[in-house]
């Protein structure tokens, strides 16, 4: 596969030389300063960031562009441009997989592990152990390195993580007579399933007509991981001992039944099958929704934290979204070398590494320095026992038309629309999601 990519790169270079590369465009390697001109494409989904070390950084684009400019300014072996390209969360496949073997292919990717991990099995993601110094390795938590390795090689560089729970508007709880369920301060609560049902029914019966109790959506795969959390509500692990989905268990079917019942009981905004997560985000930020997904990074959702409460997903479940970097082999050794130098520079420069503070840093040094300034850090730490491994080290999670994330959400949309029964939904999920896993295992190849 790598040799094919080299042929493509060499062929493109030959065509470029024959055609003169177009007026006014300097081909890579033709710098008048004697240094090679190299453009590194760094892609990332558009996301908010909460950076306590530099409040001017409010999103991933600002973070990556600043680091890229600083790296290029100090790099001496080539004239480097870090071309930061953002994409919408729902456009992952078109932004990444469909650009492989094109001029728009990413050299570096920054995003959540739940998407990045799948690319490792394409054979395009390079191991990073040769760029990780002893100092970098010692500064990152051991647990972060563990989830960054496959078959003993480190394919992902951990930067920060976010713990996913739910946030709720206390004012609506109080106005609906649910004062007793409001937590103290920023504690992360747990409610029994009977309590969950009582709370949602009470909200549905007493809220203003244009305000809805709970976020729910099924239009696309945005936020599908949070929907999977609900499938654990009655005790399902959702995977069996062999690593396959087990969504036809009594516990999983009970969770699907509970979810579907919320449509008729008025728990969700109308026609949730036609909504995506960002629709619910807008509803929550405009106080038209009571409970929504939360991880500390989405500061635009709330004003004063004291006005809100926090609770694990039904079944006392939380998840964790590690974010970090990986490097792709597009057939150009120079780009791989520079991409590794970029990551090493980022992790060895406190100004940039400290931008992980605000979320939960993977760096011990950063965590210690900013412990008192990171939103709910101690609460998230105390809640870590409720965090589940939602991916189960599964291949083909994202990145193809038959991936888990491509086939999961249509079944949830059908469930919410009433087009299928919970039992039919469970059978469809098992069939399609396990077919995705089987396909991923069959196609899996690792870069050495």
Residue spans for each PLM region:
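Long, aromatic- and glycine/proline-rich binding clefts that accommodate carbohydrate-like moieties
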Residues: 357-414, 428, 440-448
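Extracytoplasmic/periplasmic substrate-binding proteins
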Residues: 40-50, 57-60, 66, 72, ...
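Short helix-initiation/N-cap motifs at beta->coil->alpha
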Residues: 86-95, 114, 190-195, 271-285
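Short helices/loops that flank or line small-molecule/ion binding pockets
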Residues: 93-105, 122, 173, 197-203, ...
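Helix-loop-helix "hinge/cap" segment bordering the ligand-binding cleft or interdomain interface
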Residues: 77, 133-135, 148-222, 236-271, ...
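Periplasmic-binding protein-like
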Residues: 170-172, 207, 344-367
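Hinge/lid segment of periplasmic solute-binding proteins
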Residues: 88, 111-165, 174-176, 194, ...
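Conserved N-terminal structural module of periplasmic/extracytoplasmic solute-binding proteins
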Residues: 10, 18-117, 137, 334-337, ...
